[in-house]
Amino acid sequence: MTQLKGFVTHIIYRNSGNGYTVFELNTGDEITCVGTFQSLEEGEILELEGDFTEHAVYGSQFKVSSFKFSSPEDAAGMERYLGSGAIKGVGASLAARIVKRFGADTFRIIEEEPERLAEIKGISERKAMDIASQMEEKHEMREAMVYLQKYGISNTLAVRIYETYGSRLYRVLEENPYQLADDIDGIGFRKADELAARIGIHTDSDFRIRSGILYTLLHASGEGHMYLPGSVLIRRAAALLDLPQEAIADQLPNLSMDKKMVIKKNGEDTICYAFSYYYAELACARMLVELNQTMLPEGELLPAQEEAILKRVDQIQQQEGLMLDELQRKAVLESVRNSNLILTGGPGTGKTTTINTIIRYFEGEGLDLYLAAPTGRAAKRMTEATGYEARTIHRMLELSGAMPESGKKASFERNEDNPLEADVIIVDEMSMVDIHLFQSLLKAVSPGTRLILVGDVNQLPSVGPGQVLADLIASEVFPVVCLQKIFRQAQESDIVVNAHRFNKGEQIALTNKSRDFFFLERNSVPVIYKHMVQLIGEMLPKYVKASPFDIQVLTPMRKGSLGVETLNGVLQSCLNPPSEGKKEVQLGDTLFREGDKVMQIKNNYQLEWEVVSRYGIPIDKGVGIFNGDMGIIREIDEYAQTVLVEYDEQRRVTYTYPQMEEVELAYAITIHKSQGSEYPAVIMPLLGGPRLLFNRNLLYTGVTRARGCVTILGSREVVQEMIANESESRRYTSLDVRIRELKGEA
C-alpha cells in the first residue's frame, strides 16, 4: 500500500450519484487519482492510501482505498483552499485579501473570531458569519468521516449517515447503532450489528434484541410471509442473535407497546406481525369489503335483465367469432352483476376469450376500462391478446420518484385522494401481485368501480409478501369463476394438456415425440451443459424462429451446479463471449459484459429511465424499475463507472457501479422470477434438489411459461417425483381471515 500527501489541483470528473471522482493531486508531481469522494474541492489537502494501477486508456492512476483530510499548514495552502470555490462567496481575490490580513492565523480567526473577517473590505458581518458557518460544517463533516472510517464504514455510506444525523451521529452510534438500520437505506440489521460489535455494544443489549426480532420478521417477508407464529419468531431470532429464547420472548411486549409489532392470540401460540404488514392486510380487507358493498346501478338483476345481458353476450360472440361455454358466460354475467369478480383458470381454459367478451360488453355500455398487469411483459401480452392498451400497475397508478432534498419518498399519484377515472378495472396475472402493490391498487379504486381480478391460482405465489389471489378465493366472500374446460385448440398443445395433468397429479409420457413438449434424459451435469448450449445456440432458434436471447433457461434453484449463479456463467460464455469490441467489468462476484441479458432483482422506485428516439432525443421518461424486469446491457462506461441497461419498451437506465448490485445475469433465472412472462421456448434442467422446492406447483409454473415449446433436461425420476409431490412451502398470511372478520361486522 502506497501513501501520498498533496493538494487537489483539478477535479477532472465527478459522478454525483456514487461519488466516484477523478482528480489531479500535487505532491510535487501531478498524479491522477481515482476514488470515491462525496465532497472534494480543489485546494483540499489529502493524505491518501492506495496503489498505482495502469488503465488501458488513461494510463497511470493512483487508486485510492482510504483517505483523510488535512488542514493547510501555511498561508499559501490556506489561500489556495479558500480560493478554490470550496466556500461559497469566496473567490481567489477575496481569499488573497483574507490571508494577507491574517496570515497563518487565518483558520483560527475564522473558527474563533469570525466577526473579525468584517475588517476586510467586501465582507459584511453577515457574510463573515456565513463563511465561518460553512467552514464549521465542512470541519464537522470531515471529523465525522474520520470517526466513521475508523469503524470500517465506506466513504459513501459515511456521507449518508452524516447527512441523516449531522452532529447527532456520535450519540446515535454510541447509544443505539441499530437505529441506522431503520433510518438509512443500504444499512440493514447485519451491517448495523457489525458496527455495534466494533463500537462495543453488548450482545444482550435491548436495542440489539429488538432490532434482531424486527429483522427476523422482515427476512420472513422475503419468504412471502405476512407474519410468523410467536414460537417460530422466537426460535429464529434466538438463532440469529445467539441468545436464549427467553431473552427474545421478554422483548416482544415492548415492541408491541412501541407499535413496532402487532401480536394476536392464536390458541396456545401467538401470531406476530411487523406493524406495517398487519395494517396492510387490514387495509386491503377493509377496502375490498367496502367495494363489495357498493351498489351498482344494476343492483340485483331481474330475470329479464339477466336475459338481456346474455343476449348481448350472444351478439358479441357472433360479431367476434367466439364460442363461450357456460362458465365463461357466467363470468361475463357476474362481472356485470358484481363490483368485484375473481376469474381464474389454467392455460387453455379461455381466460383471454372471457376477458375480451367482458371488454366488448362494457365498451358497448360506454364505460371506461383500464387494463393492467404486474410486469411490462405481462402488460404487453395482455395488450396483444385483447387489442386494448394495458399498462403495468405501477404506470397505471402513476408512480412518481423520490425527492430526497424535500424528504419526499417515491409514491403513487393515484390514490384515495386522486382515484383512477375508470368504470371497470381488469388486472391480469394476479398471482404475482403482493400485498403492498395490492394495497396501492385498492387505494386508487373509487366506489362504484368494478374490479375484475384474473389469474391462475395454481401458479407460484408472488415474489413479495402475501398470497393475495389465493386468500381472496379462500375468503369465500367474493364471486369466483374458475374456468375448467380445455378448448380444442389448446388440446393440441402438450404444454397445456400436460400442465393440467400435473395439477391433477397425473403422470405423463416423458418422450421427445411431442411437437412442443420434450423430455431428454440426461443424468450428469456436464452432459446437461453440453445439450443446453446446443439447444440454445443451434436447434431451438430454428425450431421456434426466435433469437437465442429469447430462449429462457428456468431452474428451481439459485445455488448448485444447475442453479442460476453457475448456469449464467456457463451460458454467458456461450451466448455472449468476450470480444475486442465489448467492454466488461467485474462487480462483486459477477462479470458484466456489453450485450449481456440481465434482470433487476429488487424493486427500485427511484431509478430514472428514459426512452430515446433513433436520433438520441428523449421522447418519454419516468421512474421505477422492478423486481423481475429484464433487459440488455447496451454500454459500459469505465470512466464514469456506469452501466446503461435497456429494458422492455426501450426504457434506458444508467446504473452506477454500486447500483449494479441490484442487477444480475438472466440467461438462466429461477422459475419464481419467470412469473408473468412468456417465452418462445423454455429449457428446464431438473436433476434433483430439496423436496419442498421440487414440487408440482413449481413444475406447473415453469412449463406454462413456454409459448412455443418446453424442453426438460434431466432425470425421469425427478420429474415423476415432482408431479407426485403436492407439498408447498406454507405462507403465513391472513388476508382471508381479515376479510371474513370485517364482512361479519358489516
What are these regions (language model features)?
Residues G346, P374:
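P-loop (Walker A) phosphate-binding loop of NTP-binding proteins
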Residues V457-V623, L742:
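Conserved helicase motor core of P-loop NTPases
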Residues T357, Y361, E365-L367, G376-K380, ...:
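Conserved helicase motor core of SF1/SF2 NTP-dependent helicases
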Residues M1-L301, I309, A746:
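Accessory, non-ATPase domains that flank or precede helicase/AAA+ motor cores in DNA-metabolism machines
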Residues D620-G622, N627-A746:
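C-terminal accessory regions
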Residues K351:
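Conserved lysine of the Walker
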Residues G321-R337:
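N-terminal pre-P-loop "Q-motif" helix
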Residues L343, L371:
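Hydrophobic anchor at the beta1->P-loop junction of P-loop NTPases
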